From Swiss-Prot:
Cofactor stoichiometry and binding remark: Binds 1 Mg(2+) ion per subunit.
Organismal lineage: Eukaryota, Viridiplantae, Streptophyta, Embryophyta, Tracheophyta
A GO term for molecular function: S-adenosylmethionine-dependent methyltransferase activity
Binding site for theobromine: T26, Y152, H155, W156, F314
Keyword Hydrolase: no
UniProt keywords, alphabetically: Magnesium, Metal-binding, Methyltransferase, Transferase
Similarity comment text for this entry: Belongs to the methyltransferase superfamily. Type-7 methyltransferase family.
Pathway: Alkaloid biosynthesis
Cofactor: Mg(2+)
One Pfam short name: Methyltransf_7
Organism: Theobroma cacao (Cacao)
Protein's name according to its UniProt entry: Probable 7-methylxanthine methyltransferase 5
Function: Involved in the biosynthesis of theobromine.
E.C. number(s) listed in UniProt: 2.1.1.159
Recorded superkingdom: Eukaryota
Length: 364
């Protein structure tokens, strides 16, 4: 498989299965966690030397994707700065937004949507630019960023963990992620890859962060010590079952399924705290768990069809690259059939678990 940074993206365009149309879960999570951003902005202004007022505030949205999410974030930042400057009787600084994602992101659609923000804040001096690249590496100059934000992106790994035995044969057969039936080596490999990636992310953001700046990260996580619990693994188990069916029909090569693992990890709060402490350059100012009901008749996705569209918009690019674009409709149709049966018997995962953390640079 090619490097993740060259393959991973959300579904582009504005069609039924596009990220713009099908992904609304992140917007819901953003609404729940919205108060975090104004607090981070407030800290930036109250802790900065008043004798040297900020003239430009640099803000980054890492893994911004496309659609209403980055636009909502930009609006929240502008409103927060307007309010704080009004309270302090200070002149409004200029705001520079850096919209970051991998090169496959639909930046054209993203920038077309900026007209909404332009119309709303005509009297505010703000600017936006694309910053393509992986947040697992350096993106910005040292000490330059005042607010770095990411919502539902940093659970993506820089690469899929290497899960083979000494002979080079795949260990996670019939699966595309950790599961209850996966050997312990699979779980260990995923944790190791996440530890490496998250530690790098912390190191690079610390280098880029201005004094008194903040890093706000919101990402898929888990509440239990077991990384193979149902709420964590259900989506990937569902897709693996659908792929196994295609294998049984002779439509997918079994070796392609056995050798494929998604570059993704749901950490726990304990794992995050441990890695922040171990890396040592940042400190946790705030951390909390978000629980969103998504399954069943009263959940966020009340129908199997809407839930599969929500999954398809962020899983299809990876799966299409591995198994072929021509099979995607068959794959997600089969996944829908499986999910319909799971809904009937109450077997589907019912919760989406997120973790929100605010970080600041340690003072030397």
């Amino acid at each position: 498989m090619e490097a993740v940074k060259d393959v991973l993206c959300m579904n582009n365009g504005v069609g039924e299965n596009s990220y713009v149309k099908a992904e609304a879960l992140t917007i819901k999570v953003m609404a729940i966690t919205k108060p975090i951003v104004p607090k981070a902005v407030q800290s930036l202004f109250t802790e900065t030397d008043h004798s040297i007022p900020l003239q430009v505030v640099n803000v980054a949205d890492l893994g911004c994707a496309v659609g209403p999410q980055p636009l909502e974030f930009m609006s929240t930042v502008i409103e927060s700065i307007l309010k704080k400057c009004g309270e302090m009787g200070r002149e409004m600084p200029e705001i520079q937004f850096f919209l970051n994602d991998l090169v496959g992101n639909d930046f054209n659609t993203l920038f077309k949507g900026l007209s909404v923000v332009q119309e709303k804040y005509k009297k505010v001096s703000w600017f936006a630019m694309g910053a393509p690249g992986s947040f697992h590496g350096r993106l910005f100059p040292r000490n330059s960023m005042h607010l770095v934000y990411s919502c539902y992106s940093v659970h993506w790994l820089s690469e899929a963990p290497k899960i083979t035995n000494e002979a080079g044969l795949p260990l996670n057969k019939g699966k595309i992620y950790m599961s209850k039936t996966s050997p312990p080596a699979v779980t260990k490999a995923y944790l190791s890859q996440f530890q490496e990636d998250f530690s790098s992310l912390l190191k690079f953001r610390s280098q880029e962060l201005a004094p008194n700046g903040r890093v706000v990260l919101i990402f898929n996580g888990r509440q239990t010590a077991d990384p193979t619990n149902k709420d964590t693994c259900y989506t990937w188990d569902l897709l693996a079952e659908a792929l196994s069916y295609l294998v049984s029909q002779g439509l997918v090569d079994e070796g392609k399924l056995d050798s494929f693992n998604v570059p993704y990890y749901n950490p726990s709060q304990e794992e995050i705290k441990y890695l922040v402490d171990k890396e040592g350059s940042l400190t946790i100012e705030f951390i909390d768990t978000i629980e969103l009901e998504i399954g069943g008749p009263n959940g966020y996705w009340s129908s199997p069809e809407s839930r599969i569209r929500g999954h398809r918009c962020f899983t299809e690019p990876l799966l299409s690259h591995q198994f072929g674009e021509r099979l995607m409709d068959k794959l997600y149709d089969k996944a829908t059939q499986i999910l319909v049966e799971d809904y009937k018997h109450g077997k589907e995962a019912t919760k989406n678990i997120g973790i929100a953390v605010v970080l600041k640079k340690k003072k030397l």
